[in-house]
């Protein structure tokens, strides 16, 4: 049976309608793909708690989590990912990537110019509507 991973992603939007996107480093699984920052949900954590913890750990800032945007399951062949994405705002600090190779603020209308990981694409498509 394939490994199943339940993860969350933050669609962090600023006042200019730009969304914070992170590029996975060459050492990570799914190297060099872009994604909405986030990570795995730990045991006894809600998706919202996991998102706040992951963003603080990996990007050194605090967020407020808003409404759910998408809930996608994607089979990568060797493992299956369930990704829940939520709107979010930064409430304290500025994001600094500790694990990703690159980050950028991208206008909603330009999201499709980045090479997103397949599990993130349904959320990207919803944001482009």
Each model region followed by its residue ranges:
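Active-site-adjacent beta-strand/loop module that shapes the phosphate/pyrophosphate-binding cleft
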Residues: 5, 14, 62, 72-94, ...
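Short secondary-structure junctions
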Residues: 58-65
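Conserved N-terminal beta-strand and adjoining loop/helix that marks the start
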Residues: 1-19, 40
């Amino acid at each position: 049976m394939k490994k199943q991973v339940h993860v969350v992603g933050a669609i962090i939007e600023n006042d200019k309608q730009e969304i914070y996107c992170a590029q996975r480093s060459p050492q990570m699984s799914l190297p060099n793909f872009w994604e909405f920052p986030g990570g795995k949900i730990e045991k006894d954590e809600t998706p919202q708690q996991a998102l706040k913890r992951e963003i603080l750990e990996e990007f050194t800032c605090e967020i407020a989590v808003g409404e759910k945007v998408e809930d996608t399951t994607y089979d990568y062949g060797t493992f299956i990912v369930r990704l829940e994405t939520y709107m979010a705002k930064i409430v304290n600090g500025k994001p600094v990537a500790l694990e990703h190779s690159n980050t950028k603020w991208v206008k909603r209308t330009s999201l499709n110019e980045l090479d997103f990981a397949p599990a993130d694409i349904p959320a990207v498509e919803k944001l482009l509507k």
